Amino acid sequence: MAQEFVNCKIQSGKVVVFIKPTCPYCRKTQEILSQLPFKQGLLEFVDITATNNTSAIQDYLQQLTGARTVPRVFIGKDCIGGCSDLISMQQTGELMTRLKQIGALQL
């Protein structure tokens, strides 16, 4: 169930972030990504606490990405990590490059 839930969210051409709304790193990640000009429907924040499988979802994220912490940021099918990874990519310009590569932005 958790595996299906996560796998159906992750899609090429889309940015998906698995979050918990009370997490300050999740809020920072949402703030950063929400300022970018995404095409409609290509940025999704998934609140894993809204399911009754939060722990199982985090276990599967651990299996898939090597970490069970949130946020878990996927650009297309690739997990780039969490908030600090996103900030690093933003500072180097790699974030915009990757988002343009998958066609997620309105330019």
Curated annotation (Swiss-Prot):
Matching Gene3D superfamilies: Glutaredoxin
Similarity comment text for this entry: Belongs to the glutaredoxin family.
NCBIfam families for the chain: GRX_euk
Subcellular location: Cytoplasm
Residues annotated as signal peptide: none
Modified residues (N-acetylalanine): 2
GO biological process, one term: positive regulation of membrane potential
UniProt-listed InterPro entries: GLR_AS (IPR011767), GLRX1 (IPR047185), Glutaredoxin (IPR002109), Glutaredoxin_euk/vir (IPR011899), Glutaredoxin_subgr (IPR014025), Thioredoxin-like_sf (IPR036249)
N6-succinyllysine: residues carrying this PTM: 9
Keyword set includes Transferase: no
Gene symbol of the encoding locus: Glrx
Cellular component aspect of the GO annotation: cytoplasm; mitochondrion; nucleus
Positions of disulphide bridges: 23-26, 79-83
Domain of life of the organism encoding this protein: Eukaryota
Pfam families, alphabetized: Glutaredoxin
Molecular functions per Gene Ontology: protein-disulfide reductase (glutathione) activity; sodium channel regulator activity
Protein name listed in UniProt: Glutaredoxin-1
Main location: cytoplasm
Nucleotide-binding is among the record's keywords: no
Occurrences of domain Glutaredoxin (ranges): 3-106
Function: Has a glutathione-disulfide oxidoreductase activity in the presence of NADPH and glutathione reductase. Reduces low molecular weight disulfides and proteins.
Top-level taxonomy: Eukaryota, Metazoa, Chordata, Craniata, Vertebrata
Keywords assigned by UniProt, alphabetized: Acetylation, Cytoplasm, Disulfide bond, Electron transport, Redox-active center, Transport
